[in-house]
């Protein structure tokens, strides 16, 4: 007699309900990590940190996440039912960031935030791997819809935190930010066995060697360079822009939150459209076009830093880089053509590991300019 969870599976996996469930889960899981973008300047004030130390805090936060991506992807490809792993990530995130709110110095806080970020990181290759398997011909669109959830977290979480920081200190604001993942951790329990199973055999050492060889070819190395450079630029902008608009343009914390939220909201709405566009005309064309336009916007902002439209240009630069994120992930899966979760785990590790150096680099520049 079939398992009840198996009877539910086709109905969930064959409709948009799967995309909706994973997008909402993505939003909840990313809520606490996204709060750090606006909490970081407040933490800097509380701990009397330099801009470079604020950048280092965000870099270590991202680096901790990078350590979890690849193991999570490999584990997902070894397990037929990834839903239980996804359920576990909500509780890891909630409890991890709650503990971080009690840190009394920079290094304890950085360490606990890095460990908490691992829980959120584990969600990404597992969920996106399931979507890439379920929608093989529409990866750009499917990953774009999933990405909307995470980007909406980066819209509303900093916005809410910016408001909270005007009435409370950063520890209380961080503690309130754990509510979405904990609530979703309860809701998701019902769906833990309804995530599409993997029909391929468990990943082996031979598979890993084959995957590694494909990424060490000249084409693979060029793609790695492009992806890490892209994420360094995005993280650098996301790190320094809230600090810049507060120190140079005189924004309050709530105004900085609104500025950041607007950039992420514009980026979120564009991801499914740009992902679908890349399904039709090709990933590379979309990627190159997006980077060129975003780079031009960033140069305009640095060339005229005191102009009234500077914030608008920075919003455009961040939004455009967010636009192409789903296309970047789909481009990586198209290249490897195997083991979607492991491939995406590898790419996420590159983006948040090597790419996170953009945060500390931006902070070092801020030491001299802000």
Task: State each model region's role.
Residues 67-104, 278-284:
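Conserved MFS/SLC helix-loop-helix module at the cytosolic interface between two early adjacent transmembrane helices
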């Amino acid at each position: 007699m079939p398992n009840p969870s198996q009877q539910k599976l086709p109905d969930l996996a064959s409709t948009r309900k799967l995309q909706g469930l994973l997008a909402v889960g993505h939003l909840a899981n990313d809520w606490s990590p996204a709060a750090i973008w606006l909490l970081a300047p407040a933490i800097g004030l509380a701990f009397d940190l330099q801009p470079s130390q604020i950048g280092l805090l965000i870099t270590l936060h991202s680096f901790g996440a990078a350590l979890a991506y690849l193991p999570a992807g490999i584990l997902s490809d070894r397990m037929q039912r990834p839903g239980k792993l996804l359920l576990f990530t909500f509780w890891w995130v909630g409890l991890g960031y709650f503990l971080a709110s009690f840190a009394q110095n920079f290094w304890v806080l950085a360490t606990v935030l890095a460990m908490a970020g691992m829980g959120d990181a584990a969600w990404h290759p597992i969920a996106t791997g399931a979507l890439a398997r379920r929608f093989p011909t529409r990866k750009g669109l499917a990953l774009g819809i999933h990405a909307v959830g995470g980007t909406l977290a980066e819209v509303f979480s900093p916005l809410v935190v910016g408001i909270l920081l005007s009435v409370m200190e950063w520890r209380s604001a961080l503690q309130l930010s754990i509510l979405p993942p904990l609530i979703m951790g309860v809701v998701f329990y019902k769906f833990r066995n309804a995530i599409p199973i993997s029909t391929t055999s468990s990943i082996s050492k031979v598979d890993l060697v084959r995957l590694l060889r494909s990424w060490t070819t000249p084409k693979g190395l060029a793609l790695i360079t492009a992806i890490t450079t892209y994420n360094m630029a995005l993280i650098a902008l996301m790190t320094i822009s809230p600090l810049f608009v507060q120190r140079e343009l005189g924004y309050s914390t709530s105004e900085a939150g609104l500025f950041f939220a607007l950039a992420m909201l514009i980026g979120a709405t564009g991801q499914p459209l740009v992902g679908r566009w890349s399904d039709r005309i090709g990933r590379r064309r979309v990627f190159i076009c997006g980077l060129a336009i975003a780079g031009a916007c960033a140069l305009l902002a640095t060339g005229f830093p005191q102009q009234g439209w500077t914030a608008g240009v920075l919003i455009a630069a961040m939004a455009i880089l967010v636009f192409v994120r789903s296309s970047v992930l789909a481009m990586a899966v198209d290249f490897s053509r195997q083991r979607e979760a492991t491939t995406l785990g590898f790419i996420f590790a590159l983006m948040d590991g090597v790419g996170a150096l953009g945060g500390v680099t931006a902070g070092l520049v801020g030491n001299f300019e802000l």
